[in-house]
Amino acid sequence: MAEEEFAELGSDRSLLLVDDDNAFLTRLARAMEKRGFQTEIAETVSAGKAIVQNRAPAYAVIDLRLEDGNGLEVVEALRERRPEARIVVLTGYGAIATAVAAVKMGATDYLSKPADANDITNALLAKGEALPPPPENPMSADRVRWEHIQRVYELCDRNVSETARRLNMHRRTLQRILAKRSPR
């Protein structure tokens, strides 16, 4: 990366990387350091929040689902300490509903895994007008409902009874929906 491209980062080049996939985290940290960032890494929500409390970074790349909780907790903590920070949320589950939640919590952008270092750098450095336009074809109500059911189902560790209780629906109704939409 040329020196003029480093200037685009500004004087504070601190970058927090939070992901529970150690191999991915190590590779990404190395790639981002080559691009001029000064990286700090964390593998859990609690470690990420501790780094934010100690010294809030100018940039952050945070995985949505971590072993000890939701990456949005780190996004929220960083927004409180440093409102102007540029935050990209990564996830293996590219659902529109979670993207909206991440942006509402203060994320600058949302990328699905596997995202390469160039995509992440572009998202971190994108100016407001450079952000992609919203999709032209919004999701159908049925699709939104299915994603919500899937999200609650995963939150309940795939326990049908608990999921049905949280969704206020009969267990057998939920089982039929899951059976109908599940891949065969």
UniProtKB/Swiss-Prot annotation:
Keyword Phosphoprotein set for record: yes
Matches recorded under InterPro entries: ActR_PrrA_rreg, Bact_response_regulator, CheY-like_superfamily, Sig_transdc_resp-reg_receiver
CDD domains: REC_RegA-like
Residues with the 4-aspartylphosphate modification: 63
The record's account of how the chain is modified after translation: Phosphorylated by RegB.
A Pfam family matched in the record: Response_reg
Residues of the Response regulatory domain: 14-128
Keywords in alphabetical order: Activator, DNA-binding, Phosphoprotein, Transcription, Transcription regulation, Two-component regulatory system
PROSITE patterns (alphabetical): RESPONSE_REGULATORY (PS50110)
Domain of life: Bacteria
GO MF annotation list: DNA binding; phosphorelay response regulator activity
Function: Member of the two-component regulatory system RegB/RegA. Involved in transactivating anaerobic expression of the photosynthetic apparatus. It is a transcriptional regulator that is responsible for activating expression of the puf, puh, and puc operons in response to a decrease in oxygen tension.
Name recorded for this polypeptide: Photosynthetic apparatus regulatory protein RegA
Organism in which the protein naturally occurs: Rhodobacter capsulatus (Rhodopseudomonas capsulata)
Name of the gene encoding the protein in the UniProt record: regA
